[in-house]
Amino acid sequence: MKHEFAKRLAKGVLGIAAAGVFAAGVGSASAEELKVYTAIEADDLKRYAEEFNKQYPDIEIKWVRDSTGIVTAKLLAEKQNPQADIVWGLAATSLMLLKNEGMTHAYMPKGGDKLDKRFIDTANPPHWTGMDAWVAAICVNTIEAEANNLPIPTSWQDLTKPIYKGHVVMPNPNSSGTGFLDVASWLQMFGEEGGWEFLDALHQNIAWYTHSGSKPCRQAGSGETPIGVSFAYRGAKVKAKGAPIEIVIPSEGIGWDMEATAIMKGTKHLDAAKKLADFTVTREANVMYNSVYAVIAYPGIAEPVKHYPDNVAEAMIDNDFEWVASNRMRILKEWQKRYDSKSEPKS
């Protein structure tokens, strides 16, 4: 399969991705360097690397970080000349695509059998293992909503009402994993025809599309827009900083994806990559994930996350990950053709 669209996108983002390359860890001359591609939120990277280095101080993580869509496109563009040793914290649907392209190394991390089976690839041995679930949400600035006489939306369909015209921001799914899980979930919730009809109606109310899943919620928090379609993690973070936002879980249900880990086939640092994969499934790592995500892969240890909506787990749709992964490129091309005219410029 030729991923021409992914290659075109990657050409435009290589400079951005390069800017997201930085090292974290011990930094000693004897440390083995491990290039780790990720879409983990930037504010968590330092802490994640430090926790890993408590167990493996002789491995230095060199992060390459960007939004999910951009990281996925970069990996696909590098298929013939892989640069990443391992991916830690990318959408499971993206890793399924890489697996289908023969780009991942099958490996069951030590202790991986303790994870919730929904968070483990069905192949034996698996090509990826999950970490946590990130879920869609709507961030509403209550002050801006009141100033614009906007009722707090309670459903996805509410966002298509004329009263919200020009007051909604959401992520571009070609750049953002959150944007993609939104679009993929709407196509599942409303059916293929109904899903695109919903997106057509929503597009009429969109002020602009961002290239980050966090940005719509940040912009709602700062008052740049009354409503940002984002994800619950970022909503909780923004609310914790004192922003006047309400995190809405729409009544139809919410799309979600797993952050997951996969070793890249052909890595020259296989032993080090396996050590990182082993760490990612540990109880300690999952406690770390639970500091910001309410749903994690390791059963029985999750604690409530401050400012997270209470009904997240119940609202998560029955997501067909295989369908999402196999239809990813088709969905993204169609979305790009229909709606990209409102995307903000790439920075």
Q: What do the PLM-derived regions correspond to, one by one?
A:
Residues 118, 163-171, 198-203, 209-210, 241-265, 280-302, ...:
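Periplasmic-binding protein-like
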Residues 139-144, 183-187, 257-269, 288-289:
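A bilobed periplasmic-binding-protein/Venus flytrap-type ligand-binding module shared by bacterial periplasmic
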Residues 93-97, 221, 225-244:
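A ligand-binding cleft/hinge motif common to bilobed small-molecule-binding domains
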Residues 320-347:
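Conserved C-terminal helix/tail region of periplasmic/extracytoplasmic solute-binding proteins
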Residues 25-31:
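Sec/Tat signal peptide C-region and signal peptidase I cleavage site
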Residues 35, 39-62, 76:
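Short, polar/charged alpha-helical segment
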Residues 39, 43-46, 69, 83-224:
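Extracytoplasmic ligand-binding site segments that recognize negatively charged/polar headgroups
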